[in-house]
Amino acid sequence: MDEHYRVLALRVPSEQHPPPVATLMARRRVRVLQSILDDVVGRAALHTFDGTSGVVLLPGGPHQHAEQVTAATAQRFDTAVFVADGGEAARADLPAAGRAATELAELARALGRPAGSYRLDDLLLEYQLTRPGRARDRLAERIAPLSTRPHLLAALDAYLRHGTDRKTAAAEVHVHPNTFSYRMRRIAELTGLDPADPAGTRVLAAALTVVRAG
């Protein structure tokens, strides 16, 4: 083995297929990935990809190898693919680097981000919010009353993604602006956090991230 490797984690979304079909598709992706690695870096690359998720180790070399592998998987896989680029790691640090990259790829998928390549800098806040601890647990508790009210969660998600623009968010969830304003008031009543208040918005955004990440 080399002393240093570039660490990539791959994750594809779960799909509803009969088990035999899912197995065939997974095996095909493994073969495609091996072909990509052979073309880009040769036999020196290592991976644990099983057709759904796994880690790829690229030996020290041109940095564009990682970009080439990412682009090729996006083009040749039969589904969306999330790639987390964990950067270079020494051989002794590979297990930890692989776990961190795997968590990052899964986080991007769980949060509904577009398929593509992610680095830690792309999800710094979201990654930190999902670290275990009392604050994360409390954030989940604050938004728990919305868990049985998916229409309120959808309204909150749209509201936050559109920069608190109620008119645009209301159009996305297909309700009248007055109905949307009522939903915002219900969120405030149920959580004790007012979406119209900047401080409340920040906490609600953090809590929603925790819930989406599972």
PLM feature spans:
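Cytosolic nucleotide-utilizing catalytic cores of signal-transduction proteins
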Residues: 1-214
